[in-house]
Swiss-Prot record:
Region (Disordered): 159-216
Keyword annotations: Cell membrane, Lipoprotein, Membrane, Palmitate, Signal
Family: Belongs to the UPF0323 family.
Subcellular location: Cell membrane
Feature: compositional bias, Polar residues: 159-170
Protein name, UniProt field: UPF0323 lipoprotein HPG27_212
GO cellular component, one term: plasma membrane
Main location: membrane
Lipid-linked residues (S-diacylglycerol cysteine): 28
Signal peptide: 1-27
Lipidation (N-palmitoyl cysteine): 28
Amino acid sequence: MKKPYRKISDYAIVGGLSALVMVSIVGCKSNADDKPKEQSSLSQSVQKGAFVILEEQKDKSYKVVEEYPSSRTHIIVRDLQGNERVLSNEEIQKLIKEEEAKIDNGTSKLVQPNNGGGSNEGSGFGLGSAILGSAAGAILGSYIGNKLFNNPNYQQNAQRTYKSPQAYQRSQNSFSKSAPSASSMGGASKGQSGFFGSSRPTSSPAVSSGTRGFNS
């Protein structure tokens, strides 16, 4: 099987820890299958993954600034000072479970109408909701997809988890290029807003993939 390689230019927009992690992901598939039974169903799809960079905003919320298809799922958090760290699988699972509870009781920003109508800085997505609005959320949180799949508020708010329309479009384009392999795995091939709308094996209602959800 051919290993995926990226052009050097693909890494120009990410730096520091995120660039090092991305290079290690692309150049070496190695540890993806080292512990096949260790992880729960929450993260069993990790090798059908996404490389996601979340950036802290001034209001302590988080936005997706970059994401790419990857053999494994890695989520990097960049703080206001530019420091980066990789979230552990345990941290990711905890964040998703906490966000699931908020979805169940209706307090998640992902399912609230128009997310309060705030601006990019004021939209208030925490780490959990930012993760579930990204490609990684459709993979790691696929087991709660039914709770979001037909939710029109989620479909709009998922776009708002991205820092800009350009970041969202880069993600769309990046995953579209890998659509054959992603679709064969039931993964996150993306032609719709909200990754839960395209990660399911059954057909899903069409949703606009424009930039309607962004406020500047």
